[in-house]
Regions:
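Cleavable N-terminal export/targeting peptides
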Residues: 1-24, 204
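Short glycine/proline- and aromatic-enriched beta-strand/turn motifs that initiate or cap beta-hairpins
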Residues: 19-80, 199-201
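Structural signature of outer-membrane beta-barrel domains
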Residues: 32-36, 76-82, 110-118, 166-172, ...
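Outer-membrane beta-barrel translocator domains and adjoining extracellular loop/strand segments
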Residues: 37-46, 83-89, 116-127, 172-181
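Predominantly the C-terminal beta-signal and adjacent terminal strand-loop region
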Residues: 45, 146-204
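A generic structural micro-feature
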Residues: 47-49, 101, 135-137, 188-190
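Short hydrophobic/aromatic beta-strand or adjacent loop that forms the aromatic wall/cage
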Residues: 54, 84-86, 195
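Gram-negative (and chloroplast) outer-membrane scaffold detector with strong preference
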Residues: 58-159
Length: 204
Protein backbone atom coordinates (compact mmCIF):
# COMPACT_ATOMS: atom_id res chain seq x y z
CA UNK A 1 0.00 0.00 0.00
CA UNK A 2 1.60 3.30 -1.06
CA UNK A 3 1.53 6.49 1.01
CA UNK A 4 -1.16 8.21 -1.07
CA UNK A 5 -3.51 5.26 -0.63
CA UNK A 6 -2.82 5.08 3.11
CA UNK A 7 -3.39 8.80 3.72
CA UNK A 8 -6.49 8.70 1.52
CA UNK A 9 -8.05 5.97 3.65
CA UNK A 10 -7.02 7.76 6.86
CA UNK A 11 -8.60 11.01 5.63
CA UNK A 12 -11.80 9.19 4.68
CA UNK A 13 -12.24 7.81 8.18
CA UNK A 14 -11.32 11.14 9.78
CA UNK A 15 -14.00 13.02 7.86
CA UNK A 16 -16.54 10.25 8.43
CA UNK A 17 -16.00 10.55 12.18
CA UNK A 18 -16.10 14.34 12.06
CA UNK A 19 -19.34 14.66 10.07
CA UNK A 20 -21.23 11.55 11.15
CA UNK A 21 -24.54 12.19 12.87
CA UNK A 22 -24.23 9.26 15.25
CA UNK A 23 -21.37 7.29 16.74
CA UNK A 24 -21.99 3.90 18.35
CA UNK A 25 -19.53 1.79 20.31
CA UNK A 26 -20.48 -1.87 20.04
CA UNK A 27 -19.12 -4.76 22.09
CA UNK A 28 -19.50 -8.26 20.68
CA UNK A 29 -19.00 -11.61 22.35
CA UNK A 30 -19.66 -14.82 20.48
CA UNK A 31 -18.77 -18.36 19.44
CA UNK A 32 -17.56 -19.46 16.02
CA UNK A 33 -18.95 -22.82 14.93
CA UNK A 34 -16.17 -23.55 12.46
CA UNK A 35 -13.75 -22.08 9.93
CA UNK A 36 -13.92 -23.31 6.36
CA UNK A 37 -10.60 -22.41 4.74
CA UNK A 38 -9.57 -22.91 1.14
CA UNK A 39 -6.07 -22.16 -0.13
CA UNK A 40 -6.22 -21.24 -3.82
CA UNK A 41 -2.46 -21.37 -4.36
CA UNK A 42 -2.07 -25.04 -3.45
CA UNK A 43 -5.69 -26.21 -3.74
CA UNK A 44 -6.15 -27.25 -0.10
CA UNK A 45 -9.37 -27.24 1.93
CA UNK A 46 -9.65 -27.24 5.73
CA UNK A 47 -12.62 -27.56 8.07
CA UNK A 48 -11.39 -26.62 11.52
CA UNK A 49 -14.46 -27.71 13.48
CA UNK A 50 -15.39 -25.65 16.54
CA UNK A 51 -12.90 -22.78 16.83
CA UNK A 52 -13.75 -21.00 20.08
CA UNK A 53 -14.84 -17.52 21.07
CA UNK A 54 -14.31 -13.94 19.98
CA UNK A 55 -14.53 -10.59 21.71
CA UNK A 56 -14.49 -7.37 19.71
CA UNK A 57 -14.89 -3.62 20.16
CA UNK A 58 -16.29 -1.67 17.20
CA UNK A 59 -16.89 2.02 16.63
CA UNK A 60 -19.61 2.86 14.10
CA UNK A 61 -20.09 6.35 12.65
CA UNK A 62 -23.41 6.67 10.83
CA UNK A 63 -24.72 9.48 8.62
CA UNK A 64 -28.30 10.77 8.77
CA UNK A 65 -31.10 9.92 11.15
CA UNK A 66 -31.87 6.46 9.75
CA UNK A 67 -28.38 5.02 10.34
CA UNK A 68 -28.32 3.23 7.00
CA UNK A 69 -24.74 4.07 6.01
CA UNK A 70 -21.49 4.89 7.75
CA UNK A 71 -18.00 3.66 8.55
CA UNK A 72 -16.54 1.49 11.28
CA UNK A 73 -13.32 0.41 12.95
CA UNK A 74 -13.04 -2.88 14.84
CA UNK A 75 -10.48 -4.50 17.12
CA UNK A 76 -11.12 -8.19 17.84
CA UNK A 77 -9.53 -11.06 19.74
CA UNK A 78 -10.14 -14.79 19.24
CA UNK A 79 -9.34 -17.62 21.63
CA UNK A 80 -9.96 -21.36 21.67
CA UNK A 81 -7.86 -23.91 19.83
CA UNK A 82 -5.99 -20.89 18.48
CA UNK A 83 -5.29 -17.26 19.44
CA UNK A 84 -5.85 -14.36 17.08
CA UNK A 85 -5.96 -10.57 17.01
CA UNK A 86 -7.27 -8.43 14.19
CA UNK A 87 -7.88 -4.81 13.21
CA UNK A 88 -10.52 -4.15 10.55
CA UNK A 89 -12.08 -1.02 9.06
CA UNK A 90 -14.47 -0.19 6.25
CA UNK A 91 -17.98 0.98 5.33
CA UNK A 92 -21.08 -0.16 7.22
CA UNK A 93 -24.60 -0.69 5.88
CA UNK A 94 -27.65 -1.24 8.05
CA UNK A 95 -31.31 -2.07 7.36
CA UNK A 96 -34.22 -2.97 9.67
CA UNK A 97 -37.04 -4.65 7.71
CA UNK A 98 -39.11 -4.99 10.90
CA UNK A 99 -38.93 -4.49 14.68
CA UNK A 100 -37.62 -8.02 15.22
CA UNK A 101 -34.73 -8.11 12.75
CA UNK A 102 -31.90 -5.74 11.89
CA UNK A 103 -29.30 -6.61 9.25
CA UNK A 104 -25.86 -5.03 9.29
CA UNK A 105 -23.20 -5.64 6.64
CA UNK A 106 -19.63 -4.44 7.10
CA UNK A 107 -17.16 -4.86 4.23
CA UNK A 108 -13.64 -4.36 5.53
CA UNK A 109 -9.91 -4.32 5.06
CA UNK A 110 -8.08 -6.19 7.79
CA UNK A 111 -4.70 -6.86 9.34
CA UNK A 112 -4.53 -9.94 11.54
CA UNK A 113 -2.28 -12.26 13.50
CA UNK A 114 -3.02 -15.91 14.36
CA UNK A 115 -1.24 -18.50 16.47
CA UNK A 116 -2.10 -22.22 16.61
CA UNK A 117 -0.41 -24.95 18.62
CA UNK A 118 0.19 -28.57 17.63
CA UNK A 119 -0.66 -28.36 13.95
CA UNK A 120 -0.22 -31.45 11.77
CA UNK A 121 3.06 -30.99 9.89
CA UNK A 122 1.79 -32.97 6.91
CA UNK A 123 -0.71 -30.24 6.02
CA UNK A 124 2.18 -28.00 4.93
CA UNK A 125 3.00 -30.38 2.10
CA UNK A 126 6.71 -30.58 2.83
CA UNK A 127 8.16 -34.00 3.49
CA UNK A 128 11.39 -32.40 4.69
CA UNK A 129 9.54 -31.36 7.86
CA UNK A 130 8.96 -35.00 8.76
CA UNK A 131 5.85 -35.99 10.73
CA UNK A 132 4.38 -34.86 14.00
CA UNK A 133 3.12 -31.45 15.10
CA UNK A 134 4.24 -27.84 15.00
CA UNK A 135 3.22 -24.42 16.29
CA UNK A 136 2.05 -22.10 13.52
CA UNK A 137 2.24 -18.30 13.36
CA UNK A 138 0.35 -16.44 10.64
CA UNK A 139 0.22 -12.79 9.53
CA UNK A 140 -2.74 -11.83 7.33
CA UNK A 141 -3.66 -8.84 5.21
CA UNK A 142 -6.93 -8.99 3.36
CA UNK A 143 -10.53 -7.97 2.92
CA UNK A 144 -13.95 -9.41 3.56
CA UNK A 145 -17.48 -8.88 4.80
CA UNK A 146 -19.20 -9.54 8.10
CA UNK A 147 -22.99 -9.83 8.08
CA UNK A 148 -24.87 -9.56 11.39
CA UNK A 149 -28.50 -10.59 11.89
CA UNK A 150 -29.65 -8.88 15.10
CA UNK A 151 -32.65 -10.66 16.65
CA UNK A 152 -35.15 -9.24 19.16
CA UNK A 153 -33.11 -6.07 19.11
CA UNK A 154 -33.17 -3.63 21.99
CA UNK A 155 -31.37 -0.40 22.64
CA UNK A 156 -28.57 -2.01 24.64
CA UNK A 157 -28.42 -5.79 24.15
CA UNK A 158 -29.20 -7.90 21.08
CA UNK A 159 -28.63 -11.62 20.40
CA UNK A 160 -27.39 -12.23 16.87
CA UNK A 161 -26.35 -14.69 14.20
CA UNK A 162 -23.64 -13.87 11.71
CA UNK A 163 -21.41 -14.90 8.85
CA UNK A 164 -17.84 -13.78 8.29
CA UNK A 165 -16.31 -14.15 4.84
CA UNK A 166 -12.75 -13.04 4.18
CA UNK A 167 -10.06 -13.21 1.52
CA UNK A 168 -6.40 -12.93 2.51
CA UNK A 169 -4.36 -11.68 -0.42
CA UNK A 170 -1.22 -11.49 1.71
CA UNK A 171 -0.46 -14.34 4.09
CA UNK A 172 2.83 -15.31 5.68
CA UNK A 173 3.14 -18.48 7.74
CA UNK A 174 5.90 -19.46 10.14
CA UNK A 175 6.10 -22.84 11.87
CA UNK A 176 8.05 -23.73 15.00
CA UNK A 177 9.29 -27.33 14.76
CA UNK A 178 11.44 -28.57 17.64
CA UNK A 179 12.55 -25.04 18.45
CA UNK A 180 13.47 -24.12 14.86
CA UNK A 181 11.40 -21.46 13.06
CA UNK A 182 10.65 -22.10 9.37
CA UNK A 183 9.24 -19.55 6.94
CA UNK A 184 6.64 -20.89 4.51
CA UNK A 185 6.81 -19.03 1.21
CA UNK A 186 3.51 -19.40 -0.63
CA UNK A 187 3.63 -17.98 -4.14
CA UNK A 188 0.43 -16.20 -5.19
CA UNK A 189 -1.08 -17.20 -1.88
CA UNK A 190 -4.81 -16.66 -1.58
CA UNK A 191 -6.74 -17.89 1.46
CA UNK A 192 -10.56 -17.91 1.50
CA UNK A 193 -12.32 -18.26 4.84
CA UNK A 194 -16.01 -18.71 5.69
CA UNK A 195 -17.06 -18.60 9.36
CA UNK A 196 -20.62 -18.74 10.78
CA UNK A 197 -21.07 -17.56 14.38
CA UNK A 198 -23.56 -16.76 17.15
CA UNK A 199 -23.25 -14.14 19.86
CA UNK A 200 -24.52 -11.14 21.77
CA UNK A 201 -24.02 -7.44 20.99
CA UNK A 202 -23.84 -4.72 23.62
CA UNK A 203 -24.27 -1.06 22.62
CA UNK A 204 -22.60 1.50 24.87
Amino acid sequence: MNKKCFFGIAALFFFSAAFAKKSDVQLFSGLFFTDFEYSVSDNRFFDSGFRGGEFSVSNFNFFGEENHFGFFERLSFQAGDFFGAEFAAGPAFCAAPNDFLRIQASPFFRLGFEFEKNQNIEKYGRTSFGTGSADEYRILLGAGTTVFFFLMQSRRVSPLLGIDFSVSFFCRDFVDIDGALYYLDYENFLLLKFSPFIGVSFNL
